[in-house]
Amino acid sequence: MPYIESILAREVLDSRGNPTVEVEVYTESGAFGKAIVPSGASTGQHESVELRDCDAKRFLGKGVLQAVKNVTEVIQPELEGYSVLEQTLIDKLLIKVDGTPNKSNLGANAILGVSLACAKAAANYLNLEFYQYVGGVWPKQMPVPMMNVINGGAHASNSVDFQEFMILPIGAPSFKEALRYGAEVFHHLGKILKQKGLPTTVGDEGGYAPDLNSNEEALQIILEAIKSAGYEPGKDIFLGMDVAASEFYDKKIQKYVLASENNKSFSSKELVHYYETLVAKYPIISIEDGLDENDWDGWKYLTQKLGNQIQLVGDDLFVTNTQKLAKGIENKIGNSILIKLNQIGTLTETLETIEMAKKASYTAVISHRSGETEDTTIADLAVATNSGQIKTGSCSRTDRIAKYNQLLRIEDQLVEAPFLGLKTFYNLKK
């Protein structure tokens, strides 16, 4: 039987060269599971706590030796002898042992690593792919890739306020073709930037990070790349933005200050009207974190104005948390949630959040973090849950490409899994 025999953990590096936690779970049956935990750059105030050592002599204080120690010295003794097939029980026990509402005792990075490694050991024991184990008979849909081709904000050192400008190859007939559409646009965008004398260095998530005059210029140059690649904006490929508005919200004056707009300040309503102008002008189908995570009144107004037209994704707003999401659903705020495993800290809680979103007709976007690794868990999770969308960066950096390549493998295995394209956005009315 797949009873837990030992749990190992180590400090490894993520795509930014910062330490993170890798966990290996071994069972008496010989079944084995391994997981590496990602890390974010722009993090919501209400996320589960990522435990760091704060020892300035190691990794500028970002070491995770205490989290590793918590896995081997605290968690392992508690889980020894449990079957990895009891995922819900394991995750509840992890939460109980931690004993805090935000996992600040053991660290969400320690807890998530164990949670995922146990699930992967269970899949290994049953000789199933991870998406098959998590999704059972349900996996039947390939996700639309939300490809971050221009990085700004906290993900790049440039003059662009908004954190991500994405392309969504919604008009493609399959995931494989959608990936091709995106890759071709990415390369055309690189050529255009070079022609304009702009740098083609990339940000944390593999997108270009040029110094542009405004956020709108980013949209314009992406449209140029789409057309240059031979695709039609608004038909073959749509646009999306992760504004990450909390990053430029000034709490003192309670305004949103856009550096690229000559430090012009916007009230919540003024920023919503700015978005309305962009949506009317460009084929934008998704805006993430359009307002500060605590600006619930502003979010309410944003949803009233644009909620029927485009996808309004809550990341920092909901932090993959059922309590936060329930509040949003009750108040009709947003219509989509970004799903990040390490925001909540266990596989079970993540699946519960996705289920809650679906029951309320909110879409769920499975997402990476800016600090990623070769771990491809989120690719399997997107298919297992039929989320229909995945956000895992651009067409560069192996830590991003690893997820896309895993999805290509899964698409081959599922053979007839549909790519629903525009139908993925089932809750939009206009």
Curated annotation (Swiss-Prot):
GO biological processes: glycolytic process
Substrates-to-products reaction catalysed: (2R)-2-phosphoglycerate = phosphoenolpyruvate + H2O
GO MF entries: magnesium ion binding; phosphopyruvate hydratase activity
Pfam families in the cross-refs: Enolase_C, Enolase_N
Catalytic residues as annotated in Swiss-Prot or TrEMBL: E205, K340
Cofactors: Mg(2+)
Subcellular location: Cytoplasm; Secreted; Cell surface
Cofactor note: Binds a second Mg(2+) ion via substrate during catalysis.
Annotated (2R)-2-phosphoglycerate binding sites: Q163, K340, R369, S370, K391
Function: Catalyzes the reversible conversion of 2-phosphoglycerate (2-PG) into phosphoenolpyruvate (PEP). It is essential for the degradation of carbohydrates via glycolysis.
HAMAP family: Enolase (MF_00318)
Protein name, as recorded: Enolase
The organism's taxonomic lineage, starting at the top: Bacteria, Bacillati, Mycoplasmatota, Mollicutes, Acholeplasmatales
Gene: eno
